[in-house]
């Protein structure tokens, strides 16, 4: 299934269970792309769309296939079994843990344990889709505020992407890594989401 096909399923669920209107949607990584698509397609209405340091990659299909095929054999066992089997990957992870304090461990814990029900094809589809996000530019929906949790440590190019895809994003800068706010500071993350939904941000 494609991103638009999956978005249609989300829209149908919101139509059926919420009358086509929701207060807010949050997504990080690929989930942020879904939030953007929900806003852009205008088939449902949300008051707030919140993206958690999504990268909004738009790689060419060929490059995305190559990256997916290269990384999937390393990443899929982590998703399926909840642990790293590759010695090389384990070594790199240990190095990153020592360099970055609790972030790497918290991020791994946020991913959760083993998911034996996730198929390799599903993982491949998600990884590939995350690399070829089909988002239009300057998304601007009356009555919808787009908020972005911008982790400054992921790089300045991401601010340009956010401003490319959204006409008036409210960017919340944090001197953090990708999804570090959610992984390491969940209380701060929850308070920020609450403040946004109460119109305080």
Regions found by a protein language model. Name each.
Residues 36-40, 190:
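Short, hydrophobic alpha-helix immediately C-terminal to the catalytic nucleophile
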Residues 166-179:
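Catalytic histidine neighborhood in serine/cysteine hydrolases
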Residues 121-164, 181:
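Conserved serine/cysteine hydrolase catalytic core
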Residues 26-35:
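Gly/Ala-rich beta-loop-alpha elbow adjacent to hydrolase catalytic centers
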Residues 60, 82-139:
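Conserved alpha/beta-hydrolase catalytic His-Asp/Glu region
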Residues 1-26:
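Active-site loop/oxyanion-hole signature of alpha/beta-hydrolase fold enzymes
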Residues 40, 48-78:
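Flexible "cap/lid" loop of the alpha/beta hydrolase fold
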Residues 176-189:
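Catalytic histidine-centered segment of alpha/beta-hydrolase-like enzymes
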């Amino acid at each position: 299934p494609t991103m638009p096909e999956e978005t249609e399923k989300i829209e149908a669920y919101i139509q059926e269970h919420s009358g086509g209107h929701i207060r807010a949607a949050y997504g990080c990584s690929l989930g942020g792309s879904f939030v953007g698509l929900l806003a852009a397609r205008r088939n449902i209405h949300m008051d707030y769309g919140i993206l958690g340091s999504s990268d909004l990659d738009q790689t060419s299909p060929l490059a995305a296939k190559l990256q997916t095929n290269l990384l999937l054999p390393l990443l899929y066992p982590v998703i399926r079994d909840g642990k790293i089997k590759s010695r090389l990957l384990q070594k790199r992870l240990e190095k990153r843990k020592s360099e970055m304090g609790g972030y790497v461990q918290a991020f791994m814990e946020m991913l959760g344990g083993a998911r034996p029900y996730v198929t390799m094809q599903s993982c491949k589809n998600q990884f590939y889709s995350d690399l070829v996000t089909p988002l239009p530019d300057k998304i601007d929906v009356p009555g919808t505020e787009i908020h972005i949790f911008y982790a400054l440590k992921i790089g300045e190019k991401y601010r340009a992407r956010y401003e490319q895809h959204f006409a008036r994003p409210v960017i919340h800068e944090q001197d953090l890594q990708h999804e570090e706010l959610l992984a390491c500071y969940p209380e701060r993350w929850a308070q920020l989401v609450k403040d946004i939904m109460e119109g305080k941000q």
